[in-house]
Every structure is written in C-alpha cells, then in structure tokens.
Curated annotation (Swiss-Prot):
PANTHER family: GLUTATHIONE SYNTHETASE. Its cofactor is Mg(2+). InterPro entries: Glutathione_synthase (IPR005615), Glutathione_synthase_a-hlx (IPR014042), Glutathione_synthase_C_euk (IPR014709), Glutathione_synthase_N_euk (IPR014049), GSH-S_sub-bd_sf (IPR037013), GSH_synth_subst-bd (IPR004887), PreATP-grasp_dom_sf (IPR016185). Its main location: plastid. It is found in: Plastid, Chloroplast. Substrate binds at residues 184, 204-207, 272-274, 278, 326-329, 506, 517-518. Mg(2+) binds at E200, N202, E423. It comes from Brassica juncea (Indian mustard). Its EC number is 6.3.2.3. It holds the Pfam family GSH_synth_ATP. This is Glutathione synthetase, chloroplastic. Pathway: Sulfur metabolism; glutathione biosynthesis; glutathione from L-cysteine and L-glutamate: step 2/2.
Length: 530
C-alpha cells in the first residue's frame, strides 16, 4: 500500500509459467491448506462451482503493429493523461510532492487494457459486499482482534502501538456508531489451479480510486479511436465508478454526522507525489456535494487538533465530520510521538474515521491468516453460501508456528511468500530469501515468528503488454492484479451502503517480485473482458 494499499504482492517468473512438466512438484491447495504431490492430476480448484474457469486469452498480436502505430497510441495516451489529470509528481522535482501543479508527469500506465475473463470479474464483484460486511463484524469483536494479534504485538512495535490505541478505546467503552469503510480486495488468477485467489484485504488508505477511473476512461478513449485497427471494442472495458462511489460514500457519512459546517479531513503524508489521485475525491466532494475538504498531516493534527467535551474534533478551528486516511498505514508515517498522539486524538473523537482503529487492524495480515483457519469465518457470518464464496477465494495462509509448513517452505521457498505485518510495496520476501529468513528466525528464537505469516505464492498467466513510463513505452511480459473497491457505511443497525465500488488493475513485468505503483514497480491498467 505505498500511497495506500498499492502493492502488487504476488508475482510470477515467466520461466516458471512456461514449465509444464512439474508433476511431482510441491503444490498448494488453497481450499484445504494441505500439501499434495502431483496436484496437476487433481481436478482444478474452483472459486464458484457454477463458473467455467478459463485463463485470460490474448486479445492482441503485438507483432503485427509497427512502431509508427504504437507511437501514435503513445502520443494520444500522453495527451489524454495530461488533459484529464492522470498525473503524478515528478520525483526529480523537489517540490512536486508539496506544491500542486509543480513538476507533474503522466502516471505510469499500460498502453492498452489487459484481458480478463468475465466470469472472474463477476465473481470478484459479487464477493466485495460480503468482505465489507466481514470487516465490519470483525471490527466489533475487540477480543478477537486483541487475541489474534497478541503474539504479533510482542514481535512488531508498529502493530503493538496500534493495539495500544485499540485497547484504550475498548477500555473507555467507546463505540463507533457511524462506521465507514472504503476497502479494496486484491486478487490474482492462479494459472495452476484456474482459481481467483485473494492476496489481501486492504482497509486503510486504499490508493488510486481517482486514477482507477481515469485509466479506464483512457483505455476506452483509445479503443474508440483505434479499436477498428486493434480489433477491440471499447464496450468490453467495464465502467469504473471508483471516484464517484468513494466520494458518494464519504458524502453520505458526512450527512449522517449531521453538522453542515463540518469538513472532511484527508490525512496525508507531508510529501505526497500521488496527491492528484487524492484531489480527485476532494473535487467530487466539492462539486457534486458542496462539501469542503482539508488536507493535514498527522503532525499538523497533533498541533492544531482538539477534541471538545461533546466529542467534536476541530483542526485549525474547523469541525471535522469525516477523517479519511491516506497515510498512517506504515511506521514511516509515525516518526515521532506527535503522530501517535494525533492518531489517538482522532480515535477519541466523534468524527467518522475511515478507517477506525478497529477497521485498520481487521485488515492486517495476521487477521487474514486467522480467518483462513477452519471455523473462524463462522464466528462472524451465518450465511453458509457467503462463507463458501469467501473461503474458496482464500489462498494458502499459515502462521510460522507450524513446523511442517516451515520445513516445506525451507525446502521449496519458491512456492511461498513471507509477509510481514506491513502495508505498501517492497515489504514481502520471496525465493531464496524466504529460506534464509526462516533459518534466521529458527536461530534467533520463536518470538520473532509472530511478525510474519506465510502465504501460498500465486502464479498468474504471463501476457505481452506495452508499459508506458516517463513518456517511453516498453514491450514486456507482465502479470496483473485486480483490486475491487468496496464501500460500506453503517449507522448503528442501519446499513446505508454496502457495494462494490469500481476497480483497480495493476500490471508489472513478470520478472519483478514486488509491484507497488507508487513504489515504482508497476503501472496502472484496466481490464478487457473476454
């Protein structure tokens, strides 16, 4: 989640994908989380039994396009991006993250949409409201959150500080009557099992709801202009309402708070090159809903903020109705006690938090791993069909206190990803580094184990793509990750919004393990349904 949950966390190497004779390789069964030999002899795993699972089919023969035509596409894409605000701050310009309009450049993008089977797309959209409801129910179970993360807090200082705030809220019996969640659930299509598998559920600072819509509209525009030559139909790129739906959810939360003079506060990093994605939401709030937004860092909140006796949060003298975090998800956002004081201050107020500390913790890696255990989903959900839909999308997830799993991961590290309790690109551990870190933890003792989980490594299909960065295109083999946004708003027992809210496609070269867009690993993309 650099700049907000934006890490493309699970990757493939094209050499692995090309290998088709690994019949005796160690494979992972995401349904039962048990190792099997000769998995290729087993029937394909299915996320929904009614779906006919198929791999994305190539939609273009890239070899037939000459450089002149591709350069025309590139030129049109760059012009469109500049005219429509699909831009980021140029990291070579000192003030590009602090002064709007200074040092802008186009966002990294895929030149054309990536093929994606319509059945998987429908499935990802269908489960989004179920995941929204699950997060809300987890947030109400303080004991589950504290117990699940009890060992993690001893090994991870950042998680420990978040849990301290959560504990204080539990001790004060403070209840969040108005609860707003703007989430994103990330998936990859596993080529081996022909399954849609969830990578993670992001509950804080989910980035690119502004750019997700824009890159979709860019691709639709290019296909309307060049679709005949490309052999593509712009109508096969699904509409993306991420910007308006997130803004609408914040506006309805603002209305529920019922203070027409209050503002929405966006909590930001002091130097934010991705500010324009954030400004799109503020623009919709202002122009469509007549709601004022302010932007403050956590340090500024600590200096200017105050919680009044009635619970009202004021910052710089302005009452705040909704707090929308686009920072606060990484230890780097808390360089001093001032930032932690600000986080606690916000939590103690009556403002609607997006997310609350409980929602934030519900999206941690360890909670995700706990939910994969047999019987845990049933603690929060009654509908058996909904439980089945969620569970069948889970990849293999394990804690590091299972000696058999540790042994398997040391023997076959290429089949695992080692994940710390961190959000953002560049944190996960792959390949031989998995083995080395597991051996290190064995030497140093078990206490540090709780800072990590192990996850099945997902191997998606490799496609040929044009990647556009710094005004230059490159043709490469790449893999993609689909993130489906979800909006959830509740006031006491009344559910006001529970819906999927657009999507974010990210694509990166298949030879790279990490893939955060803001971290420089991946590009923004959209999908072409086939």
């Amino acid at each position: 989640m650099v700049g907000g949950c934006s890490s493309l966390s699970y990757s493939s190497s094209s050499t692995f994908i090309a290998t088709t004779t690994l019949s005796s390789s160690l494979k992972l069964n995401p349904q039962s989380f048990i190792f099997h030999l000769n998995l290729r002899k087993r029937p394909p795993l299915r996320c929904l039994s009614s779906l006919t699972m198929e791999s994305p089919k190539p939609i273009l023969d890239f070899e037939k396009f000459d450089d002149g035509f591709v350069q025309k596409l590139v030129y049109d894409a760059l012009v469109w991006s500049s005219l429509h605000g699909l831009v980021v701050g140029d990291k070579t310009h000192q003030r590009s993250g602090t002064v709007p309009g200074v040092g802008m450049m186009h966002a990294p993008i895929a030149l054309l949409p990536t093929p994606f089977p319509e059945s998987y797309w429908n499935q990802a959209c269908e489960v989004a409201p179920i995941f929204n409801e699950l997060v809300d129910r987890i947030s109400l179970d303080g004991k589950f959150i504290q117990d699940s993360l009890s060992r993690t807090r001893k090994a991870d200082v950042f998680t420990s500080r978040l849990l301290e705030i959560h504990s204080k809220m539990l001790e004060s019996n403070k209840r969040e009557e108005i609860r707003l969640g703007l989430h994103r659930s990330d998936y990859m299509l596993d080529e081996e099992t022909k399954s849609l598998l969830q990578i993670e559920m992001n509950t804080i600072s989910c980035s690119f709801p502004g750019f997700g819509r824009l890159v979709t509209e860019l691709h639709q525009s290019l296909l309307r202009s060049h679709g005949d030559h490309l052999g593509l139909d712009s109508k096969r790129v699904p509409r993306n309402g991420s910007t308006s739906q997130f803004a609408d959810a914040m506006a309805k939360a603002w209305l529920e708070y019922n203070n027409p003079r209050a503002v929405v506060m966006v909590v930001v990093q002091p130097d934010e090159r991705n500010m324009y994605d954030q400004h799109w939401l503020s623009s919709v709030l202002r122009e469509k809903h007549n709601i004022v937004t302010i932007r403050k860092s956590l340090a500024e909140v600590e200096t200017e903020g105050r919680v009044h006796e009635d619970g009202t949060l004021t910052v710089g003298g302005q009452a705040v109705s909704v707090v929308y975090y686009r920072s606060g998800y990484t230890p780097r956002d808390y360089p001093s006690e001032s930032e932690w004081n600000a986080r606690l201050l916000i939590e103690q107020s009556s403002a609607v938090k997006c997310p609350s500390i409980a929602y934030h913790l519900a999206g941690t890696k360890k909670i995700q791993q706990e939910l994969a255990k047999p019987g845990v989903l049933e603690r929060f959900m009654d509908n058996k069909d909904d439980i089945a839909k969620l569970r069948k999308c889970f990849a293999g997830l394990w804690s590091l206190d299972d000696p058999e799993i540790i042994k398997k991961a040391i023997e076959k590290p290429e089949l695992f990803v080692m994940k710390p309790q961190r959000e953002g690109g560049g944190n996960n551990i792959y390949g031989d580094d998995v083995r080395e870190n597991l051996l290190r933890l064995q030497r140093e003792g078990e206490e540090e184990n709780a800072a990590y989980i192990l996850m099945q490594r997902i191997f998606p299909k490799v496609s040929n793509v044009f990647l556009l960065r710094d005004g230059v295109y490159h043709k490469d083999q790449a893999i993609s990750e689909l993130g489906v946004y979800g909006a959830y708003l509740r006031n006491k027992e009344r559910v006001i919004i529970n819906e999927h809210s657009g999507y974010l496609m990210r694509t990166k070269v298949s030879s790279s393990d990490e893939g955060g867009v803001a971290a420089g690993y991946a590009v923004l993309d959209s999908i072409y349904l086939n």
